[in-house]
Swiss-Prot record:
The gene is Dpy19l1. It comes from Mus musculus (Mouse). This is Protein C-mannosyl-transferase DPY19L1. It catalyses: L-tryptophyl-[protein] + a di-trans,poly-cis-dolichyl beta-D-mannosyl phosphate = C-alpha-D-mannosyl-L-tryptophyl-[protein] + a di-trans,poly-cis-dolichyl phosphate + H(+). GO terms for biological process: protein C-linked glycosylation. One of its GO terms (cellular component) is endoplasmic reticulum membrane. It comes from the Eukaryota. Its EC number is 2.4.1.-.
């Protein structure tokens, strides 16, 4: 590498405070041409078997025309997949628009990230400190593989890690869903070796003068810098996600205008849709784009008259790509399976199609189980139990049909069978395998409806992202007209369901109904929206599923299946552009607010702490403290820690409870005894953790009062140690934020 040095002053721009982050025609007969082509001649629906909404693929026994050349065959395949009717040219123009959307989103999030952190001018240490909490923990494993003598040696190191939960040796690849870091590290090593081989410079390094009496730092730009490479790949992936959203909206609505609506709604509500521009290394940044692909494939499978093996295989692969990077993915897929089962129960999916979907989910779950080295949480999840119960109920369909009950009663029986069967099977499998890692999820949900409280639950609910959805959120949706448009589309779907169901629910003999309703993909999306709404209302962080799905649902405002009666009177383009113009009033203001966020990352107290640890402690010195700080200590100081921010493991939760007893009202000798069992040498005490609280009852001493009522009313231990750490501890380092206490062994 060529090292260039020059003095370069930063623009220390002030950073403003960030805002909290007549009767309609029959549906099957509606014309399915692009809503933007009202003036062109339309072809009436073909007789014979009717396909699902918006699909104009070849009928059974009819082959698509075979174009010449590979490019032509690819174009034809995409032409049929997108459900567009205008030929190869329209397919390529659709892909061109999708590519433009991807480029636009990549540029947008890259610009926001750079504006917020001034990332390109930070030193290596500052970049690592900018990855706070979980982000720093995940990035540390990428760094381990990148800096290892070889790729395989690096993978072995993270599979036999004793720095993360000292003195335990754990397989972090199994525990923390680290396949993204493994893949990115391999790409980085390949990229740098190839560039070195052909003599192309991959990074340029500068000497940056920081001013204010601070020492100069070296700052490197380019993909040859590990942090820059890591972030760049994440932003490229999430840029491609916007292309998927455009194709998704186009396919669901049957109109490219629907794709435009989806993309613009996403941009106008960007702060509610994603946080990748502020927190790139989080698991959702790697995982969510594959959920978008997976839902697009589910939509295609539901709409297609005949099942295609390629679509099912693609669904299985996208499931794996969604689940591998993120432990929470199984809960999202649970809502999808529940929605699909409900669509089946009311008659919009046939048994064979749902069985195939269930099989693909089962296969992908087993593949993830194997790739995660037998992570038993996957097999004992509600998702796995739900798959087994639905599979069993599909096999029992003949028995259900022989029941002499009304259609509505059969729905209730099947719904209750799924619900209680899933809960019971999950409970049984968890007991058999002795798994309690996801017990905190049940406790968290219980606390939302009842007055249940415990230490772990309060750590979650006292964080804003795990609280209920903010009351201002629906208002923000309304200002951009996203909520009103979605309500209109949902009302149209509900009207369609009501028309389909009339006369069916009253039937007393369930086996007499042979009709299979059409447009199951519309009903599925409405139910999935309902599930995401429930998640988003209960846990604010999960609105990151709700808002993008609302953007997809908004595309249905262009659907002739739902609004053909309106588009017969008014040009659809006029309606859609009027709506977009109204949306853009608040939407452009939201974008401007994001663009106005200008700042520069700096955390001098933590920088002092890390430098002191590097040069004043032994490499095997063991640290304990607040979870976010421990991630930075492990990443930048490379010291063993006993706790970390990945809170989904029962053993880690028990460790963290011991470490956080420093903020309780317990006696110092009792706390010291427990820390010594964990072989802790140094404890990093932060006074702010002792006094701050996000809301009443949420300071650390108040949380401990719930867990340890016997000591309630006593002075918190942290307050005592801030004044005088002796005789059980001794202060070895202190600045304005951190106080490092050595645990005395005598």
């Amino acid at each position: 590498m060529v090292l260039q040095a020059r003095s370069k002053h930063r623009d220390a721009a002030p950073r403003p405070p960030r805002s909290a982050r007549s009767s309609p025609p029959p549906l099957s007969g509606a014309s399915e041409v692009d809503a933007g082509e009202l003036g062109s001649e339309r072809t009436p629906p073909s007789p014979g078997r009717r396909g699902a909404a918006g699909r104009k693929g070849p009928r059974a026994g009819t082959a698509a025309p075979a174009p010449d050349g590979l490019a032509g065959r690819l174009a034809a395949g995409l032409h049929w997949a997108l459900g567009l009717r205008r030929g190869r040219g329209r397919t390529w123009s659709t892909l061109l628009l999708a590519s433009f959307a991807a480029l636009l989103h990549w540029s947008h999030i890259t610009h926001l990230f750079e504006n917020d952190r001034h990332f390109s001018h930070l030193s290596t240490l500052e970049r690592e400190m900018a990855f706070r909490t979980e982000m720093g923990l995940y990035y540390s494993y990428f760094k381990t593989i990148v800096e290892a003598p070889s790729f395989l040696n690096g993978v072995w190191m993270i599979m036999n890690d004793k720095l993360t939960e000292y003195p335990l040796v754990i397989n972090t690849l199994k525990r923390f869903n680290l396949y993204p870091e493994v893949i990115l590290a391999s790409w980085y090593r390949i990229y740098t070796k190839i560039m070195d081989l052909i003599g192309i410079q991959t990074k340029i390094c500068w000497t940056v003068t920081r001013g204010e009496g601070l020492s100069p730092i070296e700052s490197c730009e380019g993909l040859g810098d590990p942090a820059c490479f890591y972030v760049a790949v994440i932003f490229m992936l999430n840029g491609l996600m916007m292309a998927l959203f455009f194709i998704y909206g186009t396919y669901l609505s049957g109109s490219r205008l629907g794709g435009v609506v989806t993309v613009l709604c996403f941009f106008f509500n960007h702060g509610e849709c994603t946080r990748v521009m502020w927190t790139p290394p989080l698991r959702e940044s790697f995982s969510y784009p594959f959920l978008v692909l997976q839902m697009l494939l589910v939509t295609h499978i539901l709409r297609a008259p005949e099942l295609c093996r390629g679509s099912l295989i693609a669904l299985c692969i996208s499931n794996v790509l969604f689940m591998l990077p993120w432990q929470f993915a199984q809960f999202v897929l649970l809502t999808q399976i529940a929605s699909l089962f409900a669509v089946y129960v009311v008659g919009y999916i046939d048994t064979h199609k749902l069985q195939k979907i269930i099989y693909m989910h089962m296969i992908s779950l087993v593949l993830c189980f194997v790739l995660m080295f037998g992570n038993s949480m996957l097999l004992t999840s509600y998702y796995a139990s739900s798959l087994v119960i639905i599979w069993g109920m599909l096999a029992m369909k003949p028995q259900f049909l022989r029941m002499n009950v009304s259609e509505l009663s059969l729905w209730v029986i099947q719904g209750c069978g799924w619900l209680f069967g899933t809960v019971i099977l999950k409970s049984v499998t968890s007991r058999i395998f002795g798994i309690a890692d996801d017990a905190h999820i049940g406790n968290l949900l219980t606390s939302k409806f009842f007055s249940y409280k415990d230490f772990d639950t309060l750590l979650y609910t006292c964080a804003a992202e795990f609280d209920f959805m903010e009351k201002e959120t629906p208002l923000r949706y309304t200002k951009t007209l996203l909520l009103p448009v979605v309500l209109v589309t949902v009302a149209a779907i509900v009207r369609k369901i009501f028309n389909d169901m009339r006369g069916v629910v009253a039937k007393q003999r369930t086996h007499t109904r042979k009709q299979q309703f059409e447009h199951g993909e519309l009903v599925y999306h409405a139910l999935q929206l309902l599930a995401y709404t429930a998640l988003g209302v209960l846990i604010m962080r999960l609105k990151l599923f709700l808002t993008p799905h609302m953007c997809v649902m908004a595309s249905l405002i262009c659907s002739r299946q739902l609004f053909g009666w309106l588009f017969g009177k008014v040009h659809p383009g006029a309606v859609v552009f009027a709506i977009l113009a109204a949306m853009s009033i608040q939407g452009s203001a939201n974008l401007q607010t994001q663009w106005n966020i200008v700042g520069e990352f700096s955390n001098l107290p933590q920088e002092e702490l890390i430098e002191w640890i590097r040069y004043s402690t032994k490499p095997d010195a063991v640290f304990a403290g607040a979870m976010p700080t421990m991630a930075s200590v492990k990443l930048s100081a490379l010291r063993p820690v006993v706790n970390h921010p990945h809170y989904e493991d029962a053993g880690l939760r028990a460790r963290t409870k011991i470490v956080y007893s420093m903020y309780s009202r317990k006696a110092p000798e009792d706390v010291k005894k427990e820390l010594m069992k964990l072989k802790v040498n140094y404890y990093i005490l932060e006074e702010s953790w002792c006094i701050r609280r996000s809301k009443p009852g949420c300071s650390m001493p108040e949380i401990w009062d719930v867990e340890d009522p016997d000591n309630a009313g006593k002075t918190p231990l942290c307050n005592i140690l801030v004044k005088d750490s002796k005789p059980h501890f001794t202060t070895v380092f202190q600045n304005s934020v951190y106080k490092v206490l050595e645990v005395l062994r005598q």
